[in-house]
Every structure is written in C-alpha cells, then in structure tokens.
Amino acid sequence: MRRKEKRLLQAVALALAALVLLPNVGLWALYRERQPDGSPGGSGAAVAPEAIQELHSRQKKTLFLGAEQRLKDWHNKEAIRRDAQRVGNGEQGKPYPMTDAERVDQAYRENGFNIYVSDKISLNRSLPDIRHPNCNSKLYLETLPNTSIIIPFHNEGWSSLLRTVHSVLNRSPPELVAEIVLVDDFSDREHLKKPLEDYMALFPSVRILRTKKREGLIRTRMLGASAATGDVITFLDSHCEANVNWLPPLLDRIARNRKTIVCPMIDVIDHDDFRYETQAGDAMRGAFDWEMYYKRIPIPPELQKADPSDPFESPVMAGGLFAVDRKWFWELGGYDPGLEIWGGEQYEISFKVWMCGGRMEDIPCSRVGHIYRKYVPYKVPAGVSLARNLKRVAEVWMDEYAEYIYQRRPEYRHLSAGDVVAQKKLRGSLNCKSFKWFMTKIAWDLPKFYPPVEPPAAAWGEIRNVGTGLCTDTKHGTLGSPLRLETCIRGRGEAAWNSMQVFTFTWREDIRPGDPQHTKKFCFDAVSHTSPVTLYDCHSMKGNQLWKYRKDKTLYHPVSGSCMDCSESDHRIFMNTCNPSSLTQQWLFEHTNSTVLENFNRN
C-alpha cells in the first residue's frame, strides 16, 4: 500500500513540474519560431548586428504582451463560402472584359480610373483570397479593441466609394467596427450630397462629416480622426476593397502593443479592368530614396521569418492605409498640421512612430486592394507644394541627413517650410531619438539600395552605335515605348546637350536617361532575346534591367543571354543573339569609369 502511495505522490510531483515548465517551454518554442533566419555568425550579423539584436529585443517585448489571453478564429466561414459561389462581372477579382467603347478617355476623366467598368461590377463583389495559406489557420486574441474606420474622399466615383464601404461591412466582424466615418473634403458632385446621405442612412454604423472648404487629404484625415470614438483609428482610401478577414490581424498587433502602427498588404486593383492582384514582389519593406520618392526593398535574410505570413517590421509606410491606437496617435501629435493637402505625410508619421518609442509593421494576413489611378483627376489649390511638405519633414525629423536631399534637390535649400518650432518642440517633449538612430537601427538595409552618397557611375553621356554612327534617343518615346536611333547631337554645341541623348550606366548596373547627377526613374528594359529595348520604371532589382558593358563594346543582357542591336534602316533598337564582330552590336559611351566597369565585369 505504501508503494502505491509513493508512486501516486511521484506522479503528482511530476504533474506539478510539468505545469510549471511546459508554459515556459511553449513560450520558448514560440520565441524561437519567430526569430529571423539569420544566425549570429551569418553574413547578416556582419551587416548590422546591433540592429538585429535590437530587433530581437523589440520582438520579445511584443511577444509576451497578452500571451495568456484566449485566442479565436475570426474567419467568417459562411461569408467566405458565399463569396466563393459568386459569378459575374469582376467576381473573384477577375478582369472585366472591356470593349473599345469602354476604353474611351471620358471613362477616366473624372476619377483617374474607368468608372464605366466600376459601375458594372457589384458593390459586393467577391475577391480572391491571395493570402499565404498559413493565414487560414491563424488565431488572434479573443478580446480585441474596436476601431473607427476613417475614409476621406473628394469627388469620388459613386460605385468606387460605395464598394469601399460595402467591402468593409461585408468582411469585418461587426463587433470590431465602432463606426465608419466618411469625411467629404468639399466635394461638388451632386451624387455625393443628398443621394449619399440617403444611401448611407441604411447603415447605422456609417456617418458622414463634411469640411467647409477644401482642406486636402491630410487635414481631412485629421478631421475624421478627431471625431473618432473607437479604440483604434483605421485609415483607408476611398477606392479600396477590404479582403477576407483583413481586420483582426491588424487589431491583434495593436492589442499586444498599443504603440504599434500596422499596415495591411496593399494589393492592386487595375484602373482599367478592375482585376485584383498582388503588387510586384508582394511582401517588401517600405523605404525611400534621397529625392524622397517612396520605394519598396526586399526583406533581408536577417529579418525573414520561418513563417512568411508573420508580421514584419517596415521603416516607412506606403501612405493612406494603416491602423493606430487612437490615444497613441494623439500622443504623437497626429499629423503635422503644417503639412498641406497631400504628400510627405507617410514619412512624417513613419519617422515619428519609430523615433519616438513606437514601431511599425506590415501584416501579410491583412490585405486590402487599392485602385492606383491612371492620373490625379483634380487640381490642388494654387500655391500648394509637395516640395514644401518634404522640406518640412526633413527639417523636423531628418537632422543632418536632410543635406543628402538638398544635394539632389538644391531648390529645396531656400524653400520656406513654414514655422516648425512647435513640431521640433513636440519631438523634444516625446524624447525622440535621432535620425541617425533610425538609419542605423531601423532602416539599416536602405543604403544598400539607396545610398545617401551616390557611388560613381560606370559610364555616361551619349551612347553612339559604331555600325551606324547614330545615337540612342528617347525623344520619340514614352514610358513603355521602344528606344530609337537618331542623329547624334552632342557635337552641335552645348545648347544641344540635353537629356534626350544623355544616359548613365549606374552603379546598380542599369541604364537611365540623364547625367549622373540627374538620372530619371526610367531604365532600359528587355524581356526576351528578340524583344525591343524599352524604357520602364526602374525597380533596382536587376532582372530585366541588368546590363553588362563588355570590353568588346557590346551591351550584354544576362537575363535574355543576348546583346543590344539596332537597325539602320528603321532606327529600331532591339535584342539579338550576341555577335561581337557585328558593328551594330557595338556601342560607345561618351565617358567611362574603367575602375567601376572592371568591378562590374570581374565575374
């Protein structure tokens, strides 16, 4: 009998030990699972070891907040099933089959996208679930804060605005939506007045605010935020479509750390046919170049997660789609009230949150589609300058790094940024860190793609073809059109020295119009061994835009395994099978840097 009692006591002791140890083992396993792949001894550690250590510290702080709360599957399975059965124009995010009559310019004139097509697609259309498969099984905190969803608009199309609202209502748990606040920035279209009021009266959670004069996007957002009652403020644009289970992943991160700003993955809704698809490269970190253009850069190996559906840190947000704890937003001062209309605000809020004690993440399991307009369909008030906004952000937040912007944009030096005393005082009261800290701890991978000091170019000037004596020219081309040969103009006096025949073979191994100090954002691009050479948006990811200028004067294109060639008869420039003895495949740059070229061609 005593032996049985002894065994029973041993079993109880083991059970108690398990109760003590297992939660810690589980948390350790969870912690290990969330570590970046880069090991302390790997190549990434040599890049920015302190930044990686600080990242680990930030992850641990976020991990344990709310760890003991109950979790829940927030998916609306019934709604997902119904959506899967929908058929019709644009359903499942498929392109609308357009006719020539539907492509007319008038369709785009008022909105910057094809409103005729938008009007023919259901307000409740289904979207493809293009999240990572792991998102389907993710659980989030059972108790989440609610949110006020702020949607500013100015002269927005009827169907595109309503589809935005419908998508939010259809794909958001009702208990998480405190309200949807539509903020009208002084629209003058009749359908956005009483007809909109009458329609939105059908939805108790929707209310409309209106400005008394044209305020611009930034102040309109601020008006909506000041009226918000939810625990969290979520900003959307007025031509978006929220995808499946988009909201809980955002609110979960804020519930675990109230000083986290979270951004959904922004998918592309085509402005022509309204097809729904991911952005090129999908999950990438937000960044900028030193002219303050927004850029996207790959997630470095040091930051990649074992589970690609997990949230990841991003230095800079894309713009108007994000969620933030309401009280934290106002502790940060909201948007700088001195910023005019639009532009630069995403940098201001990004720098501010990182430097002043917060963090920012992109959430792969939250996806929202956005129509990228063909062009901006309205004029902003006279005297408003994007440059002024960027100068203001640089003066308040970028410290000595602002000089790199002024070197590239000398016209910014003497531009008035307005009174920034209050903003600098706010920065001081929040005990914000320096911009150098931001660049070394948060955006440490940015200089690899966009160095503050531009490395020397490999070659520049005119590109003259040996066989024809003609020069590469862009004057007849628009973005996406083929390059052409034209009579060389360099020798006709300094007045003829212009960017139409001036190119730079940059340190990125791409070729861009312009001299080394003033290159444009377009690159030589080729897709196959017989394709024309076109100008395309530079992506700095090599691929179709990678070139090698070889000692035999050929411009070799590694992706297609071919060389740039030309035709004297019709002045075409195209790719062809490499033939070093062919004079039409030999090209002379006006200036070359032999050291840089040797480094390029070393392998």
Curated annotation (Swiss-Prot):
EC number in record: 2.4.1.41
GO CC annotation: Golgi apparatus; Golgi membrane
Record topology, Cytoplasmic segments: 1-11
Membrane topology per record: Single-pass type II membrane protein
Keywords tagged on the record: Disulfide bond, Glycoprotein, Glycosyltransferase, Golgi apparatus, Lectin, Manganese, Membrane, Metal-binding, Signal-anchor, Transferase, Transmembrane, Transmembrane helix
Transmembrane segments: 12-31
Lumenal face residues: 32-603
Chief place where the protein resides: Golgi
Gene Ontology MF terms: carbohydrate binding; metal ion binding; polypeptide N-acetylgalactosaminyltransferase activity
Cofactor needs: Mn(2+)
Entry binding sites for substrate: D185, R214, S238, W342, R373, Y378
UniProt protein name: Polypeptide N-acetylgalactosaminyltransferase 10
